Amino acid sequence: CRIENCHSRRIRNIDIAEPRSHTPRGNAIPSRSAATCHVMSRTCYKVYDNAYPHFLTCIVVEWLPVFTRPDAVQIVLDSWTFLQRAGRLKLFAYVILENHLHFIASSDELSKEVGDFKSFTARKLIDLLQSAGAKTILDQLAFRKAKHKSDRDFQFWQEGSHPQQISSDEMMCQKIDYIHYNPVQRGFVDDPVHWRYSSARNYAGLPGLIEVATDWR
């Protein structure tokens, strides 16, 4: 990893930034095995084997900057926390940016749990936008609603979650670094732990906003 053991060093004098517009060895990644294919969405991306963690991406339609609102971010964090405490999802790393999020997770039914996560958060986030009177964003969410979605007035997330199977410890570390350095690469912060809405602080041994499974090696 770019930082020892995926951000294992301690960081001092931390300034926290927020989004703005513009298993021990037993938990290690299993050796590659025959894959069972499950369709994740209407895209060509699939969850190949639930024994492996997957790198996933969820994007707001039209890349709208919804997560500049702390209360919007909290809906996502609360949903992940609920799924973890219910034993339905294991979260290894995450980052939330102004219009999309990346995370690494595993589950016995990953396609289902990610689908439930997107459905629940979409409803809650639209409720939040309606209560806040965010008409401009809501109009765009309504305009971009997929034609086959006849059961709703808005579409919050783009179709699919682009799952990528993580089949080795090396790949896991690379994806964690990609997640944590995303705000740095975009020029929002100088250090991964300065970004409030990511698991970089968890991996640096500092208090994080939610729990993640850092003992995957």
Sequence positions of predicted segments:
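Short catalytic/metal-binding and nucleic-acid-binding patches
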Residues: E4-R217
